[in-house]
């Protein structure tokens, strides 16, 4: 559980106001300000000092019991609260201790609805709390997000209720987006002044995900309705796709809290990467003793079984191949081996295909200090959850990759919580694929180590989507919501001109040093290795450094970075710092200041950087050891699609 240090708590009551005029709230550092007005509906305006950043207008629920809060609702009371505490996360995604400081306004309306608004130094969040008897049918949740029309939006535009959430980011001015265009969260808005506002949500339970829809002028809240009928004729990968919907978005308890609507604010691009509002606004850990949860690296067989060489067995989904991959994991200290798609007998998760003895494989892995994970589909796993988990536990399975959820309605969001809770009962970790973005579930159930919801490395098998331009948006947008399963570290590297599609052995668009650096930049307590194990044996020098990069961190320092162009950061694990920088297809000279180290103190630095010919052959790299001093400024040269990564240790 989080260990808290709770600071000042202030309360005041304003009894039975007929109409609440504008109420103001300031962030702890008094830079951000919120002005709340209640007329026909609630509106919130957010300012940075005296400059308006954005507004949220017409906040209400449309339900079978009318509007909540009621139109022109009377306010019974207003309370304020100030919190200053330190939160210790179960899994150290960014740092070992998180500072949480906010000021809160809480409105109680005559219909017993509450509206809570929090201002952090890093942004604003609001949510509703209802107090109704019985069940509540919600037809829609309204909110108009008002930004300057010339503001630029970065988000995944999508019109599919069965979305896989793997679209590249589209960069477009609000005024140029056509009315009716929809897209999913997180969405980044850069207003004309250059300030960034990242739209997120947290504590999503028993409710659909929030999307965006372009209205006549503004961005509006959009939700997918509850499913009525499904595709019943497909396979287990698409059988739960929605064909028709009900006329409501949710049926839920009338007495509940609703998800937090989150707006992260950052003056500089680099500050987005350090924002943790989604985590802080999520429910606290629900697992009594989470000490069994083990983050780590994963090697898996999806591409690898089609790319092995220098072996004396027929590669495939079989016991011999699995043991070879487990030996590789043991040789390099990798925690997990994952069986991906293909290991099950037909559509029965309790049985394996011929030639694969799961119990023998797991026992062998255990003897080598390696844990085994299994890939499953949403449809099969949801139907067989109890029987499957019992069988997996008997085999000794330690984790699951759950794929092809491809939905964000209320029923689907409930599945995430159900799967996390049931997996925790069997002490199994989870990785969601075909999944919507993180929403705080990982704080309540830290066995949810990572998830997809991005254009990740596998897209290189048949598209150009995972290019450095899109990839360098991820740390500022997708990764702010929570861990992302990008799958870094390919040894099959290509320049922009040499890149080709190859589904069985995909190439990565960028240099060797770029993809090694992505293991520091792409934040995830579970990192996957994409390539065949044979390739990693061949490139042992790179492999050893790569898989020694931690997946948990004690501290983060963001360095000079620009959305979509270049990223630089330093992360600390124990006494070691890892520093990484990557660029888009533009070659770049960067200066990295070691200001996070004590000035003048000497350190040893191990570096992997772009080789002199990396612009021609992306596999070209230079490995060297250098002595550096705290406060020193390093000159770093990056090839097109290039990278630089270093480990800094005490002498």
Segments from the language model and where they lie:
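An acidic-aromatic substrate-binding cleft motif
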Residues: 249-328, 332
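Carbohydrate-binding surface patches
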Residues: 563-601, 644-645
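Bacterial Sec-dependent N-terminal signal peptides
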Residues: 1-22
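Glycan-recognition and catalytic regions of carbohydrate-active enzymes
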Residues: 531-578, 582, 615-619
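C-terminal beta-strand-rich structural cap/linker in extracellular carbohydrate-active enzymes
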Residues: 625-651
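N-terminal accessory beta-strand-rich subdomains and adjacent acidic, glycine-rich linkers
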Residues: 22-279
């Amino acid at each position: 559980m989080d260990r808290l240090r709770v600071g000042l708590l202030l309360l005041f009551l304003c009894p039975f106001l007929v109409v609440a005029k504008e109420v103001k709230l300031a962030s702890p550092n008094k830079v951000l300000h919120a002005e709340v007005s209640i007329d026909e509906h609630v509106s919130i305006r957010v300012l940075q000092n005296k400059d308006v950043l954005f507004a949220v207008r017409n906040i209400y629920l449309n339900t079978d019991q009318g509007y909540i809060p009621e139109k022109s609702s009377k306010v019974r009371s207003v309370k304020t609260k100030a919190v200053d505490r330190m939160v210790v996360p179960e899994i150290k995604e960014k740092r070992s201790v998180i500072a949480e400081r906010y000021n809160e306004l809480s409105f109680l309306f005559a219909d017993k609805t509450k509206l809570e608004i929090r201002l952090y130094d890093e942004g604003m969040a609001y949510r509703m709390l209802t107090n109704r008897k019985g069940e509540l049918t919600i037809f829609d949740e309204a909110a108009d997000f008002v930004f300057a029309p010339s503001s630029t939006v970065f988000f995944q535009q999508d019109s599919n209720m069965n979305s896989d959430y793997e679209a590249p980011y589209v960069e477009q001015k609000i005024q140029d987006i056509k009315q009716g265009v929809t897209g999913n969260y997180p969405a980044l808005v850069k207003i004309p002044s250059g300030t960034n506002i990242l739209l997120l949500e947290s504590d999503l339970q028993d409710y659909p995900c929030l999307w965006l829809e372009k209205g006549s002028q503004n961005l509006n809240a959009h939700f997918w309705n509850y499913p009525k009928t499904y595709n019943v004729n497909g396979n287990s990968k698409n059988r739960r796709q929605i064909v028709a919907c009900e006329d409501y978005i949710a049926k839920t308890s009338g007495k509940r809290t609703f998800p937090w609507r989150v707006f992260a604010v950052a003056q500089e691009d680099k500050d987005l990467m350090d924002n943790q509002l989604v985590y802080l606004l999520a429910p606290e850990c629900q697992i009594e003793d989470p000490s069994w949860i083990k983050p780590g690296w994963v090697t898996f067989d999806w591409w690898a079984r089609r790319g092995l060489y220098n072996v004396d067995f027929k590669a495939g989904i079989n016991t011999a191949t699995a043991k070879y991959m487990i030996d590789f994991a043991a040789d390099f200290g990798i925690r997990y081996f994952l069986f991906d798609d293909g290991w099950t007998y037909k559509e029965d998760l309790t049985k394996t295909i011929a030639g694969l003895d799961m119990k023998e494989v797991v026992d062998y892995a255990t003897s080598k200090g390696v844990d085994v994970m299994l890939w499953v589909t949403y449809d099969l796993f949801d139907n067989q959850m109890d029987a499957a988990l019992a069988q997996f536990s008997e085999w000794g399975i330690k984790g699951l990759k759950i794929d092809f959820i491809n939905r964000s309605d209320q029923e689907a969001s409930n599945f995430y919580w159900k799967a996390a809770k049931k997996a925790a009962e069997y002490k199994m970790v989870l990785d969601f694929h075909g999944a919507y973005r993180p929403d705080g579930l990982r704080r309540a159930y830290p066995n949810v180590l990572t998830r997809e919801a991005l254009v990740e490395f596998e897209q290189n098998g048949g598209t150009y989507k995972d290019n450095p331009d899109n990839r360098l948006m991820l740390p500022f947008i997708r990764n702010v919501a929570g861990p992302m399963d990008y799958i870094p570290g390919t040894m099959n590297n290509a320049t922009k001109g040499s890149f080709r599609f190859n589904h069985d052995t995909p190439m990565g668009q960028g240099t060797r040093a770029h993809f090694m650096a992505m293991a520091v930049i792409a934040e995830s307590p579970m990192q996957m290795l994409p390539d065949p194990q044979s390739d990693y044996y061949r490139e042992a020098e790179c492999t050893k450094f790569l898989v020694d990069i931690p997946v948990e961190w004690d501290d983060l320092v963001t360095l000079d970075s620009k959305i979509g162009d270049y990223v630089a950061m330093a992360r600390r694990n124990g006494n070691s710092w890892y520093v990484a920088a990557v660029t888009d297809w533009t070659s770049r000279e960067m200066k990295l200041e070691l200001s996070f180290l004590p000035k003048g103190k000497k350190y040893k630095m191990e570096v992997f950087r772009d080789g002199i010919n990396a612009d021609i052959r992306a596999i070209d790299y230079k490995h060297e050891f250098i002595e550096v001093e705290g406060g020193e400024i390093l000159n770093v040269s990056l090839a097109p699609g290039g990278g630089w990564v270093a480990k800094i240790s005490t002498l």
